[in-house]
Structures are given as structure tokens and as C-alpha cells.
């Protein structure tokens, strides 16, 4: 967040690519350029994610590998598909307020399940200690809790039913997007992203650890841009790219260290 302070893009020729920053309790409205970039930067990865997920499925040797490939693939593809659909509707059909709101909620919810799905192959296919094995189901509880939080606190102070009916906030003049809820949501993503990693790092087999760390660094760097709408042009699209780089690095680790070795040694593909 320090970089934007060093350079005020609103005073440069790049100002036309972004709107002014809004208060923390309001949602930033992207420019037409930013809308297009937000859609393209995740739409581009839909086909590769489908192909990559299919590759893991065909490399699977047993039921656990197959199940893990399905879980991870659905989480990976779901992330890019839901994000692309939401940003497209937000750009071209913003007058469909209820549809846009629901898709925005799904866009936030799917992140929790993507995080859980990204850990699934490691937790299902690697040897775990007695206490660490509980993380297999704990990570899904965390994703469910995050989803419930989004449902009740995303972009409103009034009830979900009131918002979806198009009714005004119960208190005129109050913010419908409390800043504290956005901060808690971001902290939830960070905690859920790092907490299961403690188990991964404690596994006897440490192959793939550096790739996992590298992917995590991409996500962390991307968060700088995630919170920089109105400060940096195309900030959200840049965040999308960091997500794609992080996901790609983690995919490589899963493919290389959980699926490829057994393929080279033992089997014929399905």
C-alpha cells in the first residue's frame, strides 16, 4: 500500500484509466477500461484450468487421487468462472441489482472453497500426523464459516431479504458496506490461507514446499493491489494476475509432486 503514496496516478496521464478512490464503506466503481481488464484477466484462465484439472484426473491412480483431482479442479475452475461472470454482469448488466449482488457474494464465497480445494490434494494424498489429519475436514468447516459470514455481512447493514428486494437501508444515510466487515473478510482469507499451511510444512515429505511458499507470496503481493482501487490503475485486474500466478504455481506443485511421480513409475493413463 506504500507504492501508491509515492506516486499519485490521479495526477498523471494514467488517471483516465481509473476513477477516484472511494471511502472504505463504499464500493469502488471501475472505469470501462478496468471493467474489461477485470473480465479478461480471469476469463483467460478458464480453459487452462479446465485442461489442467482434466490432466490431474487422467493421471489419478486410485480413488483418493481421483476425488482430490475433482475437488481441486472444481475449486480452481469455479474461481475463474464465477469471477468472470460476476465482473461481466457488473460491467454490462449493472442495472440487474439483485443478480449483480448475488454474483458478488458468490465471487467472495468461492474464494473460501478455492482455498480449501487447493489444500485438498496435499491433505488427502500426503502422510499426516494424528493431529494434522483433522485439517482435512477443518479446512472445509472454515470455508463454510466464511461463506456464512459473507451471506450475512457482505455489502449491507440491513437484512439480506431487504437488500435483495431492493429496499433501502433501514437507516437513511448510513453506509451499506461497513469498512470493518470488509477488513474482517480480508483477515478471514489470510487466516484460512495460512493456517492449513502449518500442517503442510510439518509433513515428513517436504517436496513441493518451496512452490507452495512461492504461490503464497504471489497471493500476498496481490493483496496490495486488491486494496488499491482508485490508487493504482487496473489494481483489481493486477490482483487477478497475481491470483493466476499463485494458482498456477500451486497447480504445478500438485501436478509435479502428487501426481506425476506415480505416473512416471507405474501406470497407464485411464
Swiss-Prot record:
It is found in: Golgi apparatus membrane. Coiled coil: none annotated. GO terms for cellular component: Golgi membrane; perinuclear region of cytoplasm. The chain crosses the membrane at residues 39-59, 66-86, 103-123, 133-153, 183-203, 206-226, 234-254. It comes from the Eukaryota. Shows restricted expression with highest levels in brain and testis. GO terms for molecular function: protein kinase activity. Residues 1-38, 87-102, 154-182, 227-233 are cytoplasmic. Pfam families: HlyIII. The keyword Cell wall biogenesis/degradation does not apply. InterPro entries: AdipoR/HlyIII-related. It is a multi-pass membrane protein. Its main location: Golgi. The keyword Ribonucleoprotein does not apply. One of its GO terms (biological process) is positive regulation of neuron differentiation. Signal peptide: none annotated. Keywords: Golgi apparatus, Membrane, Receptor, Transmembrane, Transmembrane helix. Residues 60-65, 124-132, 204-205, 255-270 are lumenal. Belongs to the ADIPOR family. This is Monocyte to macrophage differentiation factor 2. It comes from Homo sapiens (Human). The lineage of its organism: Eukaryota, Metazoa, Chordata, Craniata, Vertebrata.
